[in-house]
């Protein structure tokens, strides 16, 4: 078990507390809205690194089924408690049948992957040929990136294991993994110290705290 997986196991019981904080709830709503607009309304999807299943639960709807996959047993127990279909596993060796998934998405997962290219290639090879992948990640160049980098350097049990990326770095990973970017948007347009979170979906700028990419196999 990697140190990062062990860290998520240890914080599973309190991981969602941030979303009950007024600012945390606004961040959640902004990210949820961005995801909802950039994954199909129908089909079978996979949330890679689904953790407690909080996003999958809110994104599941009529015609849209989501399977949660995570390597942390303790985090995944929370997803099961939410009633989500859940699979214990890792992204570079998916325990799923090839050609079933209509879409895949990940939320702040790229930052914790030891071998991101291997994972992205596995996703491409496992999903349907026309399936899209949606990647939400922290913008390393933003003030939110500065915040998470700072708390990681100060020993936060989770973010000390994170590797933040710039937009250019993520696009390079996407390209070498056999994908092409078809859409780029951002959200979190305000700084972390502001109580009101800018949750609008915008064209990309250095101020966007998170970036959402929609990509397809080349």
Per-range role (PLM):
Residues 108-111:
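Short catalytic micro-motifs in class I SAM-dependent methyltransferases
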């Amino acid at each position: 078990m990697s140190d990062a997986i062990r860290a998520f196991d240890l914080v599973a019981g309190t991981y969602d507390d941030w979303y009950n904080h007024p600012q945390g709830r606004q961040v959640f709503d902004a990210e949820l809205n961005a995801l909802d607009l950039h994954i199909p309304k129908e089909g079978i999807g996979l949330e890679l690194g689904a953790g407690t299943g909080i996003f999958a639960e809110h994104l599941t709807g009529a015609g849209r089924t989501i399977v949660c996959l995570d390597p942390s047993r303790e985090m995944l127990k929370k997803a099961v408690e939410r009633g989500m279909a859940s699979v214990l596993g890792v992204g570079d060796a998916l325990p799923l049948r090839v050609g079933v998934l209509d879409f895949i998405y990940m939320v702040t997962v790229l930052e914790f992957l030891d071998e991101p290219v291997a994972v992205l290639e596995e996703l491409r090879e496992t999903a349907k040929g026309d399936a899209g992948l949606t990647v939400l990640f922290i913008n390393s160049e933003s003030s939110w990136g500065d915040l998470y980098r700072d708390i990681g350097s100060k020993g936060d049990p989770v973010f000390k294991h994170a590797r933040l990326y710039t937009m250019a770095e993520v696009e390079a990973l996407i390209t070498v993994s056999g994908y092409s970017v078809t859409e780029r948007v951002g959200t979190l347009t305000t700084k972390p110290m502001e109580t009101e979170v800018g949750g609008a979906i915008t064209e990309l700028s250095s101020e966007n705290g998170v970036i959402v990419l929609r990509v397809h196999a080349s």
